[in-house]
Amino acid sequence: MTITYTSQVANARLGSFSRLLLCWRGSIYKLLYGEFLIFLLCYYIIRFIYRLALTEEQQLMFEKLTLYCDSYIQLIPISFVLGFYVTLVVTRWWNQYENLPWPDRLMSLVSGFVEGKDEQGRLLRRTLIRYANLGNVLILRSVSTAVYKRFPSAQHLVQAGFMTPAEHKQLEKLSLPHNMFWVPWVWFANLSMKAWLGGRIRDPILLQSLLNEMNTLRTQCGHLYAYDWISIPLVYTQVVTVAVYSFFLTCLVGRQFLNPAKAYPGHELDLVVPVFTFLQFFFYVGWLKVAEQLINPFGEDDDDFETNWIVDRNLQVSLLAVDEMHQDLPRMEPDMYWNKPEPQPPYTAASAQFRRASFMGSTFNISLNKEEMEFQPNQEDEEDAHAGIIGRFLGLQSHDHHPPRANSRTKLLWPKRESLLHEGLPKNHKAAKQNVRGQEDNKAWKLKAVDAFKSAPLYQRPGYYSAPQTPLSPTPMFFPLEPSAPSKLHSVTGIDTKDKSLKTVSSGAKKSFELLSESDGALMEHPEVSQVRRKTVEFNLTDMPEIPENHLKEPLEQSPTNIHTTLKDHMDPYWALENRDEAHS
């Protein structure tokens, strides 16, 4: 009963779809012609009464009614209601088709998994697939009127060969007030387990695959049963039907052509045939008829499912697959492309025009000049290199630049990122980082960099262990002058630092300091009074004993209570040097 026109629209040509309008079976004309004739007859009866049977006063009243109906007829949301309803019906129709039980996969598993070419094996395979077909027929006769007319009772199924008399008696013993379409699937599961226990199915994995496919078909049958039971809500169908028919009942009056002599707006013409009203009836009522036909595809309409053909096809194909085709294989031979790495199937003269080369991609044929194919240096790498030069000059490591890779030995000597610029800052690193980033555009960041360099202990400064940055030589090293206010020193354990500063001793002593007097300290704290002498520290590295390898880890592993001092505003580098000297002595 399905109307197939796929071959007629295989090629989009002039008139290919227009020829479909001439079909009668399954067409909209076949569904609509009766109601359209009724609408046409009612329209011309009302027109005849208006023109010939009414008096002038009655005509005036009818004309007012016509204008009123025509002005308010558009308030009915017929397109909105019909659109949602037909979409719901078409979706439901396609889901029912997808749940039609096809035993093709199950018959392949039964033919391959259930072994034995003897009579017992053959009987086992045919019985299993017959149970599957019986379950399909039981559910189809429950939802399809065409299948029910073919098998109106269980006795007809026995006579048709879907069920044996013994199975019919077994089915009648189950006196339940429910549909019995699930019983053959239970028989199938039990018989499959018996076949596995009897050695007909070798592995439990094969049994599981067989039962999974059986459950898939059983689920599809359950879905068909649910679709037949749970329909689209009746109120929705009623609303759509009332909206469509009330719209065209109003059109019978509102779309009448009035007397042009009375000069009503929109009624300048007096046509006998309301063409667009008839077209509107054809479209909207035809739209409703589509939903009425698809709402139950298991009926006897022209476009309903061919359920009886499905029953015949499934039984014939499945029995052939599990019986005659079981282990009936053709002899294996080398194919005609046995030693050809690139097989080329031939084309006929009619299909030679469809031969195409392989598609390699839309950019495969793009050509570039030689200059355009050269790689360009990365701009970010150049900026990072420039920033690295400035950072090396200032003795800092960039926070946005990733350090080079370090091996297992140099990784321990790499200065910590947080100890360089954030030592002595609050523990809220996020606020500290935002403060540093906000002051990068100001000159103050240079002063902070110098202060951070001086505040860090010597062994944690960049270049202390790196020969390219700070060459180890016996030449004196100097520190930049303090650009800001003098630092206030706090007490350090074991040392009295009140009103005193440091002074280096260059005669005799190595790596030692002495305290300056208060006047010398005042000159150093106020460089604008007099020119301050540059302070130098001399290290004698020639007579130092050889340091073991693990000695480099000691400054990083020392407790902060032994080597760190607490300063305000800025840390004095001389105290850091002295602490380092005392810690290593």
UniProtKB/Swiss-Prot annotation:
The keyword Calcium applies. Keywords: Calcium, Cell membrane, Chloride, Chloride channel, Disease variant, Ion channel, Ion transport, Membrane, Phosphoprotein, Retinitis pigmentosa, Sensory transduction, Transmembrane, Transmembrane helix, Transport, Vision. Residues 346-379 are annotated as: Auto-inhibitory segment. The keyword Transcription does not apply. Inactivated by sulfhydryl-reactive agents. Changing residue 228 to N: In RP50; causes protein mislocalization to the cytoplasm. GO terms for molecular function: bicarbonate channel activity; bicarbonate transmembrane transporter activity; chloride channel activity; identical protein binding; intracellularly calcium-gated chloride channel activity; ligand-gated channel activity. It catalyses: chloride(in) = chloride(out); hydrogencarbonate(in) = hydrogencarbonate(out); 4-aminobutanoate(in) = 4-aminobutanoate(out); L-glutamate(out) = L-glutamate(in). Residues 52-60, 256-274 are extracellular. Its main location: membrane. Changing residue 152 to A: In ARB; no effect on protein stability; loss of cell membrane localization in transfected MDCK.2 cells; reduced whole-cell conductance. Ligand-gated anion channel that allows the movement of anions across cell membranes when activated by calcium (Ca2+). Allows the movement of chloride and hydrogencarbonate. Found in a partially open conformation leading to significantly smaller chloride movement. Upon F2R/PAR-1 activation, the sequestered calcium is released into the cytosol of astrocytes, leading to the (Ca2+)-dependent release of L-glutamate into the synaptic cleft that targets the neuronal postsynaptic GRIN2A/NMDAR receptor resulting in the synaptic plasticity regulation. This is Bestrophin-1. It comes from Homo sapiens.
